């Protein structure tokens, strides 16, 4: 039997170790496809790429930013619509077209003067693991690649693109006693 202690949250029980890790977070890094979106790529008649983003995720991101917790995006793909979404949310650290996400990660650490234990990363696939292995709180979305799930410190109860980012934002805010007073913007 495990000696792990759990804290009750609105998302269900969360291991005390995860709450302790979340209490130290100053930066949340998000992947996009499969995390901020459902992983599907919609193509318009003119070849334009379309994605759906969850408003709850956006609100959670705004709550983090207004609580002085930085948010960054590191993604392997490039899309103009992602620049627009990042601007809408107030995310100023956007790294697109990153086949090696560690390069952007190390740049963020230097720019924001963060230690690895102050960083949370939420991903869904094997390309995310090199960064996840180095951060203080590694998170996999509920429908992440099966090999990623057992490696993460925390697995969301909600699937990518369906509010998983909001779940992580709430967890960080809860751990830092900022959830009750957190407010974002209507987005």
From Swiss-Prot:
<comment type="function">
    <text>Catalyzes the hydrolysis of 3-deoxy-D-manno-octulosonate 8-phosphate (KDO 8-P) to 3-deoxy-D-manno-octulosonate (KDO) and inorganic phosphate.</text>
</comment>
<comment type="pathway">
    <text>Carbohydrate biosynthesis; 3-deoxy-D-manno-octulosonate biosynthesis; 3-deoxy-D-manno-octulosonate from D-ribulose 5-phosphate: step 3/3.</text>
</comment>
<dbReference type="InterPro" id="IPR050793">
    <property type="entry name" value="CMP-NeuNAc_synthase"/>
</dbReference>
<protein>
    <recommendedName>
        <fullName>3-deoxy-D-manno-octulosonate 8-phosphate phosphatase KdsC</fullName>
        <ecNumber>3.1.3.45</ecNumber>
    </recommendedName>
</protein>
<dbReference type="Pfam" id="PF08282">
    <property type="entry name" value="Hydrolase_3"/>
</dbReference>
<feature type="binding site">
    <location>
        <position position="33"/>
    </location>
    <ligand>
        <name>Mg(2+)</name>
    </ligand>
</feature>
<dbReference type="InterPro" id="IPR036412">
    <property type="entry name" value="HAD-like_sf"/>
</dbReference>
<feature type="binding site">
    <location>
        <position position="124"/>
    </location>
    <ligand>
        <name>Mg(2+)</name>
    </ligand>
</feature>
<dbReference type="GO" id="GO:0046872">
    <property type="term" value="F:metal ion binding"/>
</dbReference>
<feature type="binding site">
    <location>
        <position position="62"/>
    </location>
    <ligand>
        <name>substrate</name>
    </ligand>
</feature>
<feature type="binding site">
    <location>
        <position position="31"/>
    </location>
    <ligand>
        <name>Mg(2+)</name>
    </ligand>
</feature>
<feature type="binding site">
    <location>
        <position position="77"/>
    </location>
    <ligand>
        <name>substrate</name>
    </ligand>
</feature>
<keyword id="KW-0460">Magnesium</keyword>
<feature type="binding site">
    <location>
        <begin position="54"/>
        <end position="58"/>
    </location>
    <ligand>
        <name>substrate</name>
    </ligand>
</feature>
<keyword id="KW-0448">Lipopolysaccharide biosynthesis</keyword>
<feature type="binding site">
    <location>
        <position position="85"/>
    </location>
    <ligand>
        <name>substrate</name>
    </ligand>
</feature>
<dbReference type="GO" id="GO:0009103">
    <property type="term" value="P:lipopolysaccharide biosynthetic process"/>
</dbReference>
<comment type="pathway">
    <text>Bacterial outer membrane biogenesis; lipopolysaccharide biosynthesis.</text>
</comment>
<dbReference type="GO" id="GO:0019143">
    <property type="term" value="F:3-deoxy-manno-octulosonate-8-phosphatase activity"/>
</dbReference>
<comment type="subunit">
    <text>Homotetramer.</text>
</comment>
<comment type="similarity">
    <text>Belongs to the KdsC family.</text>
</comment>
<feature type="binding site">
    <location>
        <position position="33"/>
    </location>
    <ligand>
        <name>substrate</name>
    </ligand>
</feature>
<feature type="binding site">
    <location>
        <position position="101"/>
    </location>
    <ligand>
        <name>substrate</name>
    </ligand>
</feature>
<dbReference type="InterPro" id="IPR010023">
    <property type="entry name" value="KdsC_fam"/>
</dbReference>
<keyword id="KW-0479">Metal-binding</keyword>
<keyword id="KW-0378">Hydrolase</keyword>
<dbReference type="InterPro" id="IPR023214">
    <property type="entry name" value="HAD_sf"/>
</dbReference>
